[in-house]
């Protein structure tokens, strides 16, 4: 849904790296090299970014009206 701010395993800050990561990967760059450039070294943090599925636009249709 929404990218977590911190890694679930080690607590490292990863939320600020999502936008540059997804932008560069969608432009055709290798995800591994992008993560290296962003300074994401731990495999637990890399997993958080690589395996995230952004489904917030699909879920928002099911919210209750206020």
Swiss-Prot record:
GO molecular function terms noted in the UniProt entry: DNA binding; DNA-directed RNA polymerase activity; zinc ion binding
Record's keyword terms, sorted: Cytoplasm, DNA-directed RNA polymerase, Metal-binding, Nucleotidyltransferase, Transcription, Transferase, Zinc
Entry-linked InterPro entries: RNA_pol_su_RPB10 (IPR023580), RNA_pol_suN_Zn-BS (IPR020789), RPABC5/Rpb10 (IPR000268)
Cofactor binding, note field: Binds 1 zinc ion.
UniProt keyword Transferase, yes or no: yes
Catalytic activity: RNA(n) + a ribonucleoside 5'-triphosphate = RNA(n+1) + diphosphate
A GO CC term attached to the entry: cytoplasm
SUPFAM superfamilies linked to this entry: RNA polymerase subunit RPB10
Chain's role: DNA-dependent RNA polymerase (RNAP) catalyzes the transcription of DNA into RNA using the four ribonucleoside triphosphates as substrates.
PANTHER family xref list: DNA-DIRECTED RNA POLYMERASES I, II, AND III SUBUNIT RPABC5, DNA-DIRECTED RNA POLYMERASES I, II, AND III SUBUNIT RPABC5 FAMILY MEMBER
Protein's name according to its UniProt entry: DNA-directed RNA polymerase subunit Rpo10
Name of encoding gene: rpo10
